[in-house]
Amino acid sequence: MPLVIVAIGVILLLLLMIRFKMNGFIALVLVALAVGLMQGMPLDKVIGSIKAGVGGTLGSLALIMGFGAMLGKMLADCGGAQRIATTLIAKFGKKHIQWAVVLTGFTVGFALFYEVGFVLMLPLVFTIAASANIPLLYVGVPMAAALSVTHGFLPPHPGPTAIATIFNADMGKTLLYGTILAIPTVILAGPVYARVLKGIDKPIPEGLYSAKTFSEEEMPSFGVSVWTSLVPVVLMAMRAIAEMILPKGHAFLPVAEFLGDPVMATLIAVLIAMFTFGLNRGRSMDQINDTLVSSIKIIAMMLLIIGGGGAFKQVLVDSGVDKYIASMMHETNISPLLMAWSIAAVLRIALGSATVAAITAGGIAAPLIATTGVSPELMVIAVGSGSVIFSHVNDPGFWLFKEYFNLTIGETIKSWSMLETIISVCGLVGCLLLNMVI
């Protein structure tokens, strides 16, 4: 019966979001309320569970996402992202242009949300395709693959970070494992798959992009741009490595754990960026503060939706669904990684939103960790992989890709939807293989 109620809740969520076009946050809270009542929870307990779910999920997550958005916005506004892109492409040359685009997308993707990175790199992709006389998708697909993998696999992006919070996974290890799996995944979904699509040769659409192009003097140096944007990654990776190789009681371990905490790592990066991307570029504190304020507007609704997913998750836990799923897992031989991936994949195809699919699947799959002893970090990547599968017409990202690359719906499915599916399947296979050795 508990699983039937969960299924009803998921169907209700789909109806509210797809049929009635309801805001994701409101829909998630209403579904959490409905599932709690159907499970027989008292009214006051349901409300308390929803509050606890929102608060527990957004506790440190709001700080991480807030600081991450600030870092990304400063990187974009000062021309740092453009500097990274143009320098890498100049170094690689036309023959290896796909790899330059992949590396650029991967580097930029660490600091920027997918949509921001996508729009930011488009002029560069258009310029490369025109100057090298190559099909647009030949460089567009590697760019999209790199951005999508960082968005689905790696903290501090919203989906992986929120799932890591739900699963109580170590952010540093999640980042480390995610990076290991991301590299072959990007290669297959990007440069390799792009060669299959060389027959789709569409002209660059006119009038779709009018963002600022920075002059040489306006942009910070390549080294400053790269190292400032990668500060959180370096600090979190340092913590993960220190915890693996240093004995307990080592003097450096507390320092590494403090500096590598995701909140501290992103805060330190923002403080450095305020100087390297702001004061050092001649910007006033008022201008820097305007950038910081505008960055939060970008993620405000995203934070609420994630909080709503946390509320749904908490109701499932407090109503006993987690224990029911845990008991079921004792009677099945299905890999918890495969099950978590499948839940996220079904929700992704039905809902369209990778973030909502990831958060909802995280709440449903959370009991599997305690029951099976599977690595919570690999579970984060499994859910993240499932949440990006087969983007189609109910996903805004589908239409973003279609319009900017001047494609038909069929061509978008062949390129974008299949690209996302390759990423999803590679992520699952990678998790299953990595699970054998850790």
Curated annotation (Swiss-Prot):
Q: Which InterPro entries match?
A: Glcn_transporter (IPR003474)
| Membrane-spanning intervals of the chain | 2-22, 23-43, 52-72, 108-128, 134-154, 174-194, 222-242, 258-278, 292-312, 327-347, 349-369, 370-390, 418-438
Q: Which Pfam families match?
A: GntP_permease
Q: Its pathway?
A: Carbohydrate acid metabolism; D-gluconate degradation
GO MF annotation, one: gluconate transmembrane transporter activity
Task: Keyword check for Magnesium, yes or no.
Answer: no
Q: Name one GO cellular component term.
A: plasma membrane
Q: Which superkingdom is the protein from?
A: Bacteria
Q: Where in the cell is it found?
A: Cell inner membrane
* Keywords associated with the record: Cell inner membrane, Cell membrane, Gluconate utilization, Membrane, Sugar transport, Transmembrane, Transmembrane helix, Transport
Q: Per the UniProt entry, what is one GO biological process?
A: D-gluconate metabolic process
- What is this entry's stated membrane topology? Multi-pass membrane protein
PANTHER family noted in UniProt: GNT FAMILY GLUCONATE TRANSPORTER (PTHR30354), HIGH-AFFINITY GLUCONATE TRANSPORTER (PTHR30354:SF22)
| Family that this chain belongs to | Belongs to the GntP permease family.
Which function does this protein serve? Part of the gluconate utilization system Gnt-I; high-affinity intake of gluconate.
Name this polypeptide is given? High-affinity gluconate transporter
Q: Which organism is it from?
A: Escherichia coli (strain K12)
